[in-house]
Amino acid sequence: MIMNQKPFNEKSSLVGAFGHMVIKQNGKLCGCGRRGCIEAYASGNAIDKILKKTNKKNISTKNMLINYKDTKWSKKIISEATTFIAEGIVNVNTLTGIRNFIIGGSIGLSHNFFREIIKNTKKITKQNILIIKAGLKNDSEVFGCLAKSNDE
């Protein structure tokens, strides 16, 4: 998260971590140990688990987003995952007034997934929120970590 043109980060590893915002009370267990985090519903790993439970064991999230993007079951999975992300975006906007959001990661940068995030955000709020793709693609987190380490 960027606030006042600087990476927002405290010593706690989860401060500023959008994916670890609880979006569903007593929800699915997340890798961080909490329940109901966005990441437990909308990450590549979370979608892989959904695919395995729906007898799509041989299909990865990336494969689904490329080769099965127009199937009914794929659209449902994408819609549900992106709704959780959209809720998180609207919550951050409501709490902080932040209106610009950058989406990264291999899943978030997928055209259909990204488009659904925007669509679902517009369904939830009338606020003028700008959502764009990370310019550094999958390397944005690496460069962010490097920038942060140079500050310390």
Question: What kind of region is each of these model predictions?
Answer:
Residues 1-2, 21:
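Short beta-strand scaffold segments in enzyme catalytic cores
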